[in-house]
Regions:
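Polar/acidic, low-complexity leader/linker segments enriched in S/T/G and N/D
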Residues: 1-46
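Ordered hydrophobic segments in well-structured contexts
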Residues: 15-25, 35, 109-113, 127-133, ...
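Oligomerization/assembly interface segments of phage tail-like spikes and tubes
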Residues: 46-48, 56-57, 61-85, 150-165
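Structured, beta-strand-rich domain cores
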Residues: 62-140
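Mixed-charge, glycine-accented linear interaction segment located at domain edges/termini
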Residues: 139-142, 146-218
Length: 218
């Protein structure tokens, strides 16, 4: 038996940052198209909801609790967005340089990276890859203001809902998280090669079952 010890060196872990955003627009056939870099990404706020308990009573006592289905949502904030995202934001092109709004919104996938730091290695300790599937962006306001003596760039923001995808042996999910401090380096590289592309292959968004095959070495 061992006595509990708190705040040991190297175990004071924190998470911060957001970078390396990649957008994967979903085609009409349901397959994600090749990924494109999302520059200017400033924040992604994950907002799961649901799993609300409903108490059932019998024989004058609490009998059990049923929980509602859990859903995954998020808010994306950025200074800019890829041209490919316009179709996900309800825009369509009438011709080069001309777009119209209030059109059908395409679903998309998203990948981004956050830092996993600790008290010894700081921000160089590791990182997490966050994958989001079946996302759709809600309409959002865009606030333009006059240039003044305290200039600020417009920050775009989108609330996102998701439709989960199937995972063999588990409930469907709309999110996958990959921790570089725990996964084997070779398997992490194989996943990143798919996400970011290589000299020989386009960047793609692997589904959870494909990621599971890589992790299990199949």
């Amino acid at each position: 038996m061992a006595k509990l010890v708190w705040d040991e060196s190297g175990k004071r872990v924190y998470e911060t940052g957001v970078r390396n955003g990649v957008l994967y627009v979903q085609g009409e056939n349901g397959v994600y198209e090749k990924g494109v870099a999302w520059n200017g990404l400033t924040a992604v706020t994950e907002s799961p909801s649901g799993a609300e308990p409903t108490a059932l009573y019998a024989d004058d006592i609490k009998y059990l609790e049923l929980f509602s289905a859990e859903e995954f949502g998020a808010t994306i904030e950025a200074y800019t967005y890829p041209e490919e995202f316009e179709a996900c934001d309800g825009s369509a092109s009438l011709g080069k340089g001309v777009t119209i709004g209030q059109q059908d919104r395409k679903a998309f996938g998203l990948c981004y990276r956050t830092i996993v730091g600790n008290d010894v290695k700081g921000n160089e300790n590791g990182y997490k890859l966050h994958l989001i599937y079946g996302a759709k962006a809600k309409p959002s306001e865009k606030a333009y203001a006059t240039v003044n003596d305290s200039p600020e760039a417009v920050t775009f923001s989108w609330e996102v809902t998701t439709t989960p995808v199937n995972v063999a042996g588990f409930k469907p999910t709309a999110s996958v998280t990959i921790d570089s401090t725990k996964i084997e380096a070779g398997k992490l590289k194989a996943i990143e090669d798919k996400l970011y592309g290589t000299q020989d292959q386009e960047p793609t968004l692997p589904l959870p079952d494909e990621i599971a095959q890589i992790v299990k070495g199949q």
